[in-house]
């Protein structure tokens, strides 16, 4: 009987360890994907291919000769889940959502305003800041 009681905590411990043993599962989560996309890339744009506002944000970076990491949510099976993560993270469910050096810039209008007032260039670290 004592051996059986001792085996229960060991079995519980092993279940907990094995449940956490798959780090790949954590990186497959939409939340982990979003965090990795934001912090592993200088510029990240969460976009949809058909969205004119997303096209505008991408055009701004193209005009600046920048090459952002673009996540096209409508082309991903987990696009809706990623959009829900963005809602939790920045309080917006719309696209585009633009991040520069880990900092949330905002949507299309926010990005255009940051570009026109020089804030975007400052975030990018470009010396050609417009004033």
Swiss-Prot record:
Binding site for [2Fe-2S] cluster: 51
Gene name linked to the record: GRXS6
Superkingdom as given in the UniProt entry: Eukaryota
Key word Membrane present: no
Subcellular location: Cytoplasm
Record protein name field: Monothiol glutaredoxin-S6
One GO term (biological process): cellular response to oxidative stress
Similarity comment: family membership: Belongs to the glutaredoxin family. CPYC subfamily.
NCBIfam families per UniProt: GRX_euk
A GO MF term: metal ion binding
Purpose of the protein: May only reduce GSH-thiol disulfides, but not protein disulfides.
InterPro entries reported in the protein's UniProt record: Glutaredoxin, Glutaredoxin_euk/vir, Glutaredoxin_subgr, Thioredoxin-like_sf
Cited PANTHER family: GLUTAREDOXIN 2, GLUTAREDOXIN-C3
Membrane-traversing stretches: none
Keywords recorded for this protein, A-Z: 2Fe-2S, Cytoplasm, Iron, Iron-sulfur, Metal-binding, Redox-active center
GO cellular component entries: cytoplasm
Main localization category: cytoplasm
Domain Glutaredoxin: 31-131
